[in-house]
């Protein structure tokens, strides 16, 4: 990151931040995407099992990685304020937190996964695949969480191209292992959805190893000497980190877990409905990688400018990110409307699943505008380290408005499973409105401070 003077310079620098992040997020998502699509071609039962397992795993992983994402705004503001010497301590303490969080998640999972699955009254093969999927994914928790911290450090320096290269190097491993283990090719055992979990876990370890090597040997990362001193765990540092990270993590958890909760509540419907819902939701999540990537770029850019006390520049980066997100949303809405048949065909050859997935995809169009506002706005707020109000707004919009409304529509109207999608759309719209108002308030506060000084 460097200081910019004109709007065109900001747009160029933002694009240089965004594009590698986008490729990275798409590559990471591709692991889940290939898990889902390839499992679906194994059988509808494998697809449903992976859907249930993923719906339990994703909220946990995204919530905790959200906490660890606090590394990015903290390091970005330190670099912006010329405090490079403080960066290694922050990163190492975050790594310690990542490892501790990993063991806590694994321990909790040992006692809760089986009761949760038993309580869902799934078909026996679906429950078995989901349980095995989660057991294997647990082995990849430590590398995934640790990588999240190290990636936050790399991205905060504006070197998002590096994380892009790391992920692109790892993606083929995931795809090849999926091909071998899901379908049993070249003499490997045919494991179906369980093979997808093994492939993803192995890939997480590869990503971590590559990242550690790059940070230790390549500039500008090596000059920070991140691994030179293994600092003692500092509870005061953990407290400061968690003060920022916990609201970020819970906001992300509330947002992602509502989709997972809907998938779990879909267990009352048929396996065909679960599979179709998962296919449509998976593609909607694929499109979500764009506003998410814009949000991550905004956190870096806004955090850097706030650290340097250039508040007007931070405000301009916010508008750039939201404007780009809305443009992409329009493009994706057109894509969903005209190519719903082709998109559904990616996930399944089953006629019933295909038809129902097309119906769900139409609702995904309405997600686009709300996501284009809510997600980038949260990224900008993280750059300001303003996270507590966003947490409350997200909780209300998704869990107080969206999910209860979806349940009512699904249970007491003819909308059935589609009622959940309508509830989500309304909740997302409220969330986007609340968050945008908060961003304007924060920008006004910092602009006023800047004018007074």
Curated annotation (Swiss-Prot):
Membrane association type: Multi-pass membrane protein
Superkingdom as given in the UniProt entry: Bacteria
Pfam (any one): MatE
Localization per record: Cell membrane
Keyword terms of this UniProt record: Antiport, Cell membrane, Ion transport, Membrane, Transmembrane, Transmembrane helix, Transport
First-listed, main subcellular location of the protein, grouped into a coarse class: membrane
InterPro entries according to UniProt: MATE_fam (IPR002528), MATE_MdtK (IPR050222), MdtK-like (IPR048279)
GO molecular function, one term: xenobiotic transmembrane transporter activity
CDD domains xrefs: MATE_NorM_like
Transmembrane intervals: 15-34, 47-69, 89-111, 132-154, 164-186, 193-215, 248-270, 283-302, 317-339, 388-410, 420-442
Biological process according to GO: monoatomic ion transport
GO CC annotations, alphabetized: plasma membrane
Function comment: Multidrug efflux pump.
NCBIfam families xrefs: matE (TIGR00797)
Family membership: Belongs to the multi antimicrobial extrusion (MATE) (TC 2.A.66.1) family.
The name this protein goes by in its record: Probable multidrug resistance protein NorM
Gene (UniProt): norM
């Amino acid at each position: 990151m460097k200081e910019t003077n004109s709007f065109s310079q900001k747009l160029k620098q933002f694009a240089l931040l965004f594009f590698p992040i986008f490729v990275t997020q798409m590559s990471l998502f591709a692991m889940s995407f290939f898990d889902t699509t390839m499992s679906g071609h194994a059988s509808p039962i494998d697809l449903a099992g992976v859907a249930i397992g993923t719906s339990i795993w994703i909220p946990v992983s995204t919530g905790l990685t959200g906490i660890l994402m606090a590394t990015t705004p903290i390091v970005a503001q330190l670099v912006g304020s010329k405090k490079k010497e403080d960066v290694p301590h922050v990163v190492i303490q975050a790594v310690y937190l990542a490892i501790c969080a990993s063991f806590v998640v694994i321990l909790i999972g040992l006692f809760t996964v089986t009761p949760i699955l038993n309580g869902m009254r799934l078909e026996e093969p679906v429950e078995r695949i989901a349980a095995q999927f989660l057991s294997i994914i647990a082995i990849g928790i430590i590398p995934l969480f640790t990588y999240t911290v190290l990636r936050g450090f790399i991205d905060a320096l504006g070197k998002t191209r590096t994380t892009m290269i790391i992920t692109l190097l790892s993606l083929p491993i995931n795809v090849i292992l999926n091909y071998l283990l899901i379908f049993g090719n070249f003499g490997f055992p045919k494991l179906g959805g369980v093979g997808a979990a093994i492939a993803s876990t192995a890939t997480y370890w590869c990503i971590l190893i590559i990242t550690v090597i790059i940070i230790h040997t390549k500039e500008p990362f090596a000059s920070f000497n991140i691994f030179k001193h293994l600092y003692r765990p500092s509870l005061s540092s953990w407290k400061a980190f968690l003060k920022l990270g916990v609201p970020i993590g819970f906001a992300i958890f509330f947002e992602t877990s509502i989709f997972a909760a809907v998938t779990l509540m879909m267990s009352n419907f048929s396996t065909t409905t679960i599979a179709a819902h998962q296919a449509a939701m998976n593609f909607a999540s694929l499109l979500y990688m764009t506003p998410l990537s814009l949000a991550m770029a905004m956190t870096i850019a806004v955090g850097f400018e706030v650290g340097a006390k250039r508040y007007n520049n931070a405000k301009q980066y916010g508008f750039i990110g939201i404007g780009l997100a809305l443009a992409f949303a329009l493009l994706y809405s057109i894509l969903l409307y005209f190519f719903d048949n082709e998109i559904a065909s990616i996930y399944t050859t089953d006629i019933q699943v295909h038809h129902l997935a097309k119906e769900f995809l139409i609702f995904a169009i309405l997600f686009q505008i709300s996501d284009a506002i809510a997600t980038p706005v949260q990224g900008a707020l993280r750059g300001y380290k303003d996270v507590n109000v966003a947490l409350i707004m997200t909780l209300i919009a998704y869990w107080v408005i969206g999910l209860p409304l979806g349940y009512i529509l699904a249970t007491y109207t003819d909308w059935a499973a589609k009622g959940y999608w309508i509830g989500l759309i309304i909740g997302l719209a409220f969330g986007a409105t609340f968050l945008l108002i908060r961003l304007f308030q924060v920008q006004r506060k910092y602009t006023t401070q800047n004018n007074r000084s």
